[in-house]
Amino acid sequence: MPPPEATRLSPHRALGLPLVFTLGLVAFGFLDAVRQNPRLLWSILGAAAALVVWNAVLTLSALRTGRTLKLEIVLRKQHYLQACAQASVLLYWGWYWREVYDSAHLIAAQLVFAYAFDMLLGWSRRDTYTLGFGPFPVIFSINLFLWFKPDWFYLQFLMVALGFAVKELIRWDKDGRRAHIFNPSSFPLAVFSLGLILTGKSDLTWGQDIASTQFYLPHMYVTLFLIGLPGQFFFGVTSMTMSAVVTTYVFGLLYFAATGVYFFYDSYIPIAVFLGMHLLFTDPSTSPRTELGRVIFGMLYGLSTVVLYVLLGRAGLPTFYDKLLQVPLLNLSITLIDRLARSSALRALDPAALGPSLVPRRRNLAYMSIWTILFAVMSAVQGVGDSHPGQWLPFWRQACKDERPYACPYLEDVLSSFCGRGSRWACNEGGMLDRVGAVESSAPPTLDDYPIILRGSKGPIVERTPAVLYAVACREGWPDTCGHAPD
């Protein structure tokens, strides 16, 4: 396909385009949801003011030097397919956690800000700007993992700006061409995550709510699996996702065999981590080129998530950062990983040696077939899915009785949470566990307790008839509930 022909524009016409997006950002300030929060309003107006000043300075400079600016329109499949996948997750997630829908205008505000910022940055450094869907996957990706609460939303604009600045300014030679080093969404996520950790200000964000509410959705694992398939077919990233998932799952199995409890407590792979394995670190532009390198890349992401979970937990820090902090370091390591993958020591392990005559699309299909089989097996044995036993109290009560590592402290935390939601039984159980240090025999939960204590890590139980509650309790392993005839 021939390269797109750029349209030549005068500075006034060219720089009118980012100004239109800036005015679109100002328009969000007229929404009632924004006007009712002065700090949010000033965040939006402040971001717009900075863009207006930059636009004016760039226009005057271009007029003074007689520059002719150019505009290319390139619609890259990588961008719009990824954006469609991310948008699907956002739409499905918002149905079960309304904060996503309530924040739709803020996601849109970030998007128009991103277009204006990217245009101004591009034309500040060169004469040609390429317009396409590029900002969509960056903004959607950031908002799948971290966003600031309205009172601190100016930090969200700074996070977006950092992502586009890093993509433009920090580059290296890759396969004979200049390319960005860092993924423009994962880099600002990592930097701001580190800043929030160091300042102890994680409560300025929805980070913990994001990580937990993404599991409220029914069949979320299979949803992410299906959403990831088009990108895996077209861009050959299956080996990264598959190796990351399998590595983390195998570690979880070994940990359970050694301790009798689950490493991530309520899952083998938390849903937010599973999301990161599909839609965060798999950017083909910032990942290894070799097939073995991509397998190693995925394994390192999975193992680094495990290590970060331990380090953050032992430091008393929020563990939802475990999927975010490592990605820039992995991006920096891709040339080393490719060099290692091409070495004689690992040549025998290179999957590219299998079926060397396969064209890329058929090779992608082969990887996807293997991944589909593995995912089906993991789902069948509750390696992923909605029914992991680590969600349910009966497992942790028995684990605490058996004095398995970390079981009693975790059980106490869960009971405290359920007590805070209104379960008197959980309050009583938690009090006894705190006093005695072990699970004691007590009265069974009542029907008033069941809607609270049966939800596990999922969203609220909607249907609360006695028959349904006893059926759920039986499925979770509560004693004397199977075959119970409610009064």
Regions found by a protein language model. Name each.
Residues P188, L196-Y249, L253, A257:
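Internal active-site segments that recognize and position negatively charged phosphoryl groups
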Residues Q36-G46, F215-H219, T241, F263-I271, ...:
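Loop-to-transmembrane alpha-helix initiation sites
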